[in-house]
């Protein structure tokens, strides 16, 4: 599962910062790098002039995503 699908499945529609990020990702569906790795998504966010809080939130979400993917493999 890629990061985009994980975020949408887990957080889309929730009234939380993570839900807001998932909503923004879905809203930008045509441009968001759905199959991007961490660096590609960070480049995209910087290119969209995302605020520092958004970047920090993405990094926390990415860590959780990596842990969830690793746990699925166990």
Regions found by a protein language model. Name each.
Residues 1-23:
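N-terminal acidic leader/helix
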């Amino acid at each position: 599962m890629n990061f985009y699908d994980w975020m949408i499945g887990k957080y889309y529609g929730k009234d939380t910062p993570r839900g807001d990020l998932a909503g923004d990702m879905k809203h930008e569906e045509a441009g968001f790098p759905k199959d991007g790795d961490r660096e590609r998504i960070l480049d995209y966010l910087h290119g969209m002039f995302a605020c520092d809080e958004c970047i920090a939130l993405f990094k926390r979400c990415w860590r959780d995503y990596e842990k969830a993917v690793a746990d699925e493999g166990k």
